């Protein structure tokens, strides 16, 4: 099951050239860029691991691509995404986020049903990948 989080998630994976164009756009807007990775694909997992430091005041697309390639080499079997942060007063938010690397196999999610007070049903879901300990999921 393909994970759909962030911008472009319903499109085919971006090529390196397309990624460069998105980074160039973010740089032209003076947005700070960071690279994150995780092996926990749950949609509510907001705490991905940060690769290095955020790339504040970077005006060179190749510098970002170098960091991206370094992250890909070390975490090739995990999810990797790029975030762009706009620090403009009144915005101060992540304005662009897209996945640029995925595991070769994405196992999908399990629906979990439990009974609550008054026989009410509660539903939650978890990734099949999280059945294994962190660091050995993919």
Curated annotation (Swiss-Prot):
Pfam families: RuBisCO_small. Keywords: Calvin cycle, Carbon dioxide fixation, Chloroplast, Photorespiration, Photosynthesis, Plastid. CDD domains: RuBisCO_small. GO terms for biological process: reductive pentose-phosphate cycle. Heterohexadecamer of 8 large and 8 small subunits. Belongs to the RuBisCO small chain family. In this alga, in contrast to plants, the small subunit is encoded in the chloroplast. The basic functional RuBisCO is composed of a large chain homodimer in a 'head-to-tail' conformation. In form I RuBisCO this homodimer is arranged in a barrel-like tetramer with the small subunits forming a tetrameric 'cap' on each end of the 'barrel'. This is Ribulose bisphosphate carboxylase small subunit. It comes from Antithamnion sp. (Red alga).
